[in-house]
């Protein structure tokens, strides 16, 4: 990986983030695909969240993932929030499009993409969700949105 001033910057913000596998995973995939991206973790204390979000724009970062405890509070610092994220009251992805910061909630995307990738359609099926972690609410909401 050759990092230059043109390398696109990505990351994850949370408190703490040292436990996250995201940097290792994203940098590995980026390197294998030949993308000019770098992804790093940023420990952001709750009282510094506004400064951190302004830093995304100021540094020209392409975007960040958002983890606990910032998924709700981050919304107040964004220019736009996707309708699904608004309904959930939770943002886990911030995209910087030429200085406009938009928040999304992509927590349920993997839940639906994995079976489809394997040729399994979950629409119209009975599904059991075990647990109530951060992905449960977005997944259940999306199931109700996509149910026939």
Language model: regions and residue ranges:
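Phosphate/diphosphate ligand-binding glycine-rich loop within oxidoreductases
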Residues: 3-118
């Amino acid at each position: 990986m050759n990092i230059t001033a043109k390398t696109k910057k990505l990351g994850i913000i949370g408190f703490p983030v040292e436990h996250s596998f995201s940097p290792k995973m994203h940098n590995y995939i980026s390197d294998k695909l030949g993308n000019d991206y770098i992804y790093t973790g940023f420990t952001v204390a709750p009282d510094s969240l506004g400064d951190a979000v302004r830093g995304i724009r100021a540094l020209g970062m392409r975007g960040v993932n958002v983890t606990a405890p910032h998924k709700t509070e981050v919304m107040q610092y964004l220019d736009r929030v996707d309708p699904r994220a608004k309904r959930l009251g939770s943002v886990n992805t911030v995209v910087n499009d030429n200085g406009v910061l938009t928040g999304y909630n992509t927590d349920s995307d993997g839940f639906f993409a994995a079976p489809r990738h394997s040729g399994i359609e979950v629409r119209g099926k009975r599904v059991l969700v075990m647990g109530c972690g951060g992905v449960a609410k977005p997944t259940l909401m999306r199931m109700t949105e996509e149910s026939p």
